[in-house]
Amino acid sequence: MDGDVVSVERVIPAGPAAIFALVADASRHPDIDGSGTVQQVKPGAPQLLGLGSTFGMSMHMGIGYSTVSTVVEFEQDRRIAWQTYPVGFLAKFVAGRIWRYELEPTEGGTLVRESWDISQDHQRMLLRLGRLPEKTAANMARTLERIEELVTAP
């Protein structure tokens, strides 16, 4: 963990546009999620995300809960990030983390970097403790594997 950010990266043998189209489609997030917590997009999410887009997710990590996210960074085929807040009681305790994807064309495909940025989270000090950063990095590595599987499938 570099300060308040955990990042993983992988070269995926596909162009940035194909990868970005997958990541910028909130309805596909359950398909790419390597943690198993993202269950389904809530009704009303835009077909493709853009700066300022808001979307909700049904989540499950021990218990079911809902989140709402807003796209806070957007550069077509290069970068997308959304800030996530739980809905309801949990929002008082854990809220504000940013999930970011950065894509760089490279030899053999695209370097994809996923980051978990807790610099604006209400409980960032608590989130740094224990094995959560390590566990999050492992889940993000699985997410990048799933993205590769989906964009390279015949």
How should these model regions be labeled?
Residues 86-138:
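Beta-strand/loop substructures that line and gate deep hydrophobic ligand-binding cavities in soluble
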Residues 1-45, 143:
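Hydrophobic ligand-binding cavity/cleft-lining segments
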Residues 2-4, 51, 63, 95:
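Residue-level preference for beta-strand/loop junctions
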Residues 41-90, 111-113, 142-154:
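Glycine-rich portal/gate segments that line the openings of hydrophobic small-molecule binding cavities
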Residues 31-32, 64, 92-93:
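Alpha-helix N-cap/helix-start motif
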Residues 16, 64, 96, 133, ...:
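A structural signal for well-ordered alpha-helical scaffolds and beta->alpha junctions
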Residues 8-10, 67-73, 96-105:
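Hydrophobic/aromatic beta-strand elements that line small-molecule binding cavities or substrate pockets
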